[in-house]
């Protein structure tokens, strides 16, 4: 079996075990034994527990980002792109509930340190697409010009929080059923910044005239 195929098998089994057991109870030995691999094969693919857990995290985030990027870049207008982003976000969470719960969870610093470099490579493309989306929305008059972190909190924050609750069993409505409501919430939140900007400018002009 090729190195690539072995790595894929390890990641699939590690994903299953991490999402079922949690990081604390997860072991490389458990993955090795489930797949019938030698210790050497496991070590060659992933040298440590944090490295394997980080790889699962990065692969999960990359899969989510691919879905979001495809949705955003396939839309023919700013409004449609935002709606597509929210829909893709909710659909991915619903289709990958256990993995989403793992991604939303709090992972040890040692795992995040291992994930930092490969995740940054994926984030570069994803953040570029988000920057283009928010610029498009701003130029369309649907929001003020904002830093990405602020725009992202307003746009995806409600959907992200609902997804977090749903994956933990604290909410019962499947995410897809809330697509329209959360799309409207995102549009309204971003639009509120544009209105605020307009009011500020009007007040400034009045002050200058006075």
Segments the model singles out, each with a brief description of its role:
Residues 6-14, 31, 56-60, 64, ...:
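Generic hydrophobic, amphipathic alpha-helix propensity
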Residues 6-9, 17-51, 55:
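Helix-turn-helix
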Residues 49, 56, 60, 64, ...:
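Hydrophobic/aromatic residues within well-ordered alpha-helical segments
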Residues 55, 69-95, 151-155, 179, ...:
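Hydrophobic alpha-helical connector segments
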Residues 62-66, 113-140, 149-153, 180:
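Amphipathic alpha-helical packing segments from all-alpha helical-bundle domains
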Residues 88-91, 127-139, 158, 164-210:
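C-terminal peripheral helix-coil segments that are non-catalytic and often amphipathic
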Residues 93-114, 131, 164, 168:
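Amphipathic alpha-helical segments used for helix-helix packing
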Residues 101-105, 146, 174, 198-199:
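Short, hydrophobic secondary-structure boundary micro-motifs
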